[in-house]
Amino acid sequence: MREYASDRVDLRSDTVTQPTESMREVMASAEVGDDVMGDDPTVNQLQDKVSKMLGKEAGLYVSSGTMGNAVAILAHTRPGDEIVAYTKSHIFRYEGGGYASLAGCSM
């Protein structure tokens, strides 16, 4: 693993973050609910805030860029469509044709 200066925050992945003790305390005391059932107040507040900021009727929180890509592709394509992506894009290089398989599209 590459070494970085100690004054940098590494946000490449949630697997390399190091929460502080105060962050852990906030997480432990946070009000939570089942997001699948629409009962998580934090997710609901975030979706409402962002949809209002963007002037949209509603928002949908997705937990990763990968999930966002999947939602977008499934919303905008039908089986048999072609997905056009830059050859150096993450979706083309690292997703291994998963989206093409998921959506029934060619890449």
Named regions from a protein language model:
Residues 75-93:
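Conserved PLP-anchoring active-site segment centered on the Schiff-base-forming lysine
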Residues 15-16:
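Short coil/turn segments
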Residues 2, 8-11:
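Pyridoxal 5′-phosphate
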Residues 19-65, 87-93, 98-100:
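Conserved N-terminal alpha-helix of the aminotransferase class I/II PLP-enzyme fold
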Residues 102-107:
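PLP-dependent aminotransferase-class I/II
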Residues 50, 68-76:
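Buried hydrophobic packing segments
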Residues 8-9, 31-33, 81:
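A short, structure-level motif marking secondary-structure boundaries and short turns
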Residues 2-4, 59, 78, 84, ...:
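Structured catalytic cores of enzymes that bind and process phosphorylated ligands/cofactors
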